[in-house]
Amino acid sequence: MDQPTILVVDDIPENVELLEAYLVPEKYHVVTAYNGIEALEQAKETPPDIVLLDVMMPQMDGFEVCQTLKNDPKTQFVPVVMVTALKERDDKLRGIEAGADDFLTKPIDRVELLTRIRSLIRVKFLHDDLEKSYVELQE
């Protein structure tokens, strides 16, 4: 299995560095973006296996980024984990409506982060295998 690619998106460099410090030792390939527009460009350039997405960002917030990713056929099945300091129920509902697959509340618990990532990547890889098999059957 290839090294899974994780797109980490946060406008605060220290938050990005913290997530990288958790992920790189676990053998994940980390790609970073510091705003929503950059995140969408990175997702096109280097298709991720999962996106860790901050909610509160300038220019384009995480809800908009998530919705854009989920509306794009090339990224619609990429799991998106909203990473947020927001704890309101309405914010979580808005994230679900935008297509988020999971939520993590700041401050991030390292063990919880890694467990959720492993679970979502496993599902993503199963989906990719199923899609590949379907295409092969169609040929």
PLM segments and residue spans:
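Receiver (REC) domain active-site loop signature in two-component systems and cognate sites
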Residues: 57, 80
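Two-component/phosphorelay signaling modules centered on CheY-like receiver
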Residues: 4, 13-37, 45
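Amphipathic alpha-helical coiled-coil "transmission" helices that mediate dimerization
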Residues: 120, 125-139
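Active-site beta3 strand of CheY-like receiver
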Residues: 46-55
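A Lys-centered signature of the CheY-like receiver
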Residues: 58, 106
